Regions:
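Positively charged, small/polar-rich N-terminal and surface patches that mediate targeting and assembly
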Residues: 1-82
Length: 82
C-alpha cells in the first residue's frame, strides 16, 4: 500500500522470530520486518499509515539515516517518490 500511495519506491518484508521483554516477561512471537525505501520527507506519513494497520500498541517504526549508497539507485528512488 505504501508503494501504491507513492510514499515508498520499494518495500521488503521479512518473516522473523522475535524475542522481547514485554509486560514483565520474555515473549516470543512470529513477526515481519518491513523495510521501506523512501525519502526522509515521507517518514511522518508512513508512520501514520503503519500505525493505522499495525496490530501492536507500540510498533517499532524507525528512521535510519543513509550515509552512502548506489547513486543510480538513489536517483531512481528520488524519481519514484520525490
Amino acid at each position: 500500500f505504501l508503494v501504491k500511495k507513492r510514499l515508498a519506491a520499494c518495500c521488503n518484508i521479512f518473516p522473523v522470530e522475535s524475542i522481547s521483554w514485554w509486560q514483565g516477561k520474555v515473549g516470543q512471537n512470529k513477526e515481519a520486518v518491513l523495510i521501506v525505501k523512501t525519502l526522509e520527507k515521507n517518514f511522518q506519513k508512513i508512520e501514520k499509515e503503519v500505525k493505522k494497520l499495525h496490530g501492536y500498541k507500540t510498533p517499532c517504526i524507525l528512521e535510519i539515516p543513509l550515509k552512502r549508497g548506489n547513486l543510480k539507485y538513489l536517483n531512481w528512488l528520488k524519481e519514484e517518490v520525490g
